[in-house]
Amino acid sequence: MEISRDALARMIDHTLLRTDATPAQVSALIAEARELGVFSVCVSPSMLPLTDDLAPLKVATVCGFPSGNHTPATKAAEAAESSRLGADEIDMVINIGHLKAGEPHRVIEEIVTACRAAEEAGADFVKTSTGFHPAGGANTHAVALMAATVNGRLGVKASGGIRDWNTAQEMVAAGATRLGLSASRAILEGAPA
């Protein structure tokens, strides 16, 4: 079942995480987010000072991004600083190498293990990907597996590679409760009339 344009907009983290993003581009992202009626903006921690007083928009940022190879202490410090700077939500990237070292090398088992670890750690959401890996971003198989694993106890954020209305709808149908998008306008403009 397809959800409406407005319902989809309320699921979007309007995202700008490019390493070359400028303050002017972040300000434009915020203005566009307000215009589109999305749930939140997601920016790099260094851009958080530009996000003061965005209510009703929420502010998300990243931690350990994009590789996840930071130490736990570094991630904790980064998360604390981001929270102090006003982040409502933090997307923390796990260390895939550590996950693989203790588990079989099967991707499905790694995804399930990561979802369970996130739940045990008290996370509110699990996220498919950063969108920065050469292998691509979210896919419906991973979203469905994650949604089945967390079974409504956590949200599922599909992120990376979602560029059109139909793909966004497929992610929601697969179980995504949030969408991390840099192409929000194009996707919402692709909604059926």
Which residues does each predicted region cover?
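Alpha/beta enzyme core
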Residues: 2-36, 40-41, 46-156, 164-186, ...
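Short hydrophobic "strand-cap" motifs at the C-terminus of beta-strands
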Residues: 159
